Curated annotation (Swiss-Prot):
Positions of disulphide bridges: none
Record localization: Secreted
UniProt name for this protein: Lantipeptide Flvbeta.a
Crosslink (Lanthionine (Ser-Cys)) position: S43-C49
This protein's GO CC annotations: extracellular region
Stretches assigned to coiled coil: none
Job of this protein: Lanthionine-containing peptide that does probably not show antibacterial activity, since its analog [+3]Flvbeta.a does not show antibacterial activity against M.luteus. Also does not show antibiotic activity when tested with [Del2]Flvalpha.a, an analog of Flvalpha.a, which is encoded by the same operon than Flvbeta.a. The bactericidal activity of lantibiotics is based on depolarization of energized bacterial cytoplasmic membranes, initiated by the formation of aqueous transmembrane pores.
Name of the coding gene: FlvA2.a
Main localization of the protein described in the UniProt heading: secreted
Keywords of the record: Secreted, Thioether bond
Keyword Cytoplasm set for record: no
Propeptide residues according to the Swiss-Prot or TrEMBL record: 1-28
Post-translation changes: Maturation of FlvA2 peptides involves the enzymatic conversion of Thr, and Ser into dehydrated AA and the formation of thioether bonds with cysteines. Modifications are processed by the flavecin synthetase FlvM2. This is followed by membrane translocation and cleavage of the modified precursor.
Length: 63
């Protein structure tokens, strides 16, 4: 995957992500880092995703 495509897809390099997390959290504890990593990647992915979360909701099974 080329660097440009990765940027478009919202893929962030681990070291860049660590820097962003440090800026956001003031250096979170390592225990929490994985959660923040995944949350960050998911939110980053959703921002770049052409589908908005509202378009996904109707597909979910109703109770």
């Amino acid at each position: 995957m080329s660097e440009k495509n990765m940027e478009k897809a919202g893929v962030v390099k681990a070291d860049e992500l660590d820097e962003m997390i440090d800026e956001t959290t003031g250096g979170a504890s390592t225990v929490n880092t994985v959660g923040i990593h995944t949350t960050y990647l998911i939110s980053k992915g959703l921002q770049n995703c052409p589908l908005k979360p509202t378009t996904i909701l109707p597909i979910l099974p109703r109770k």
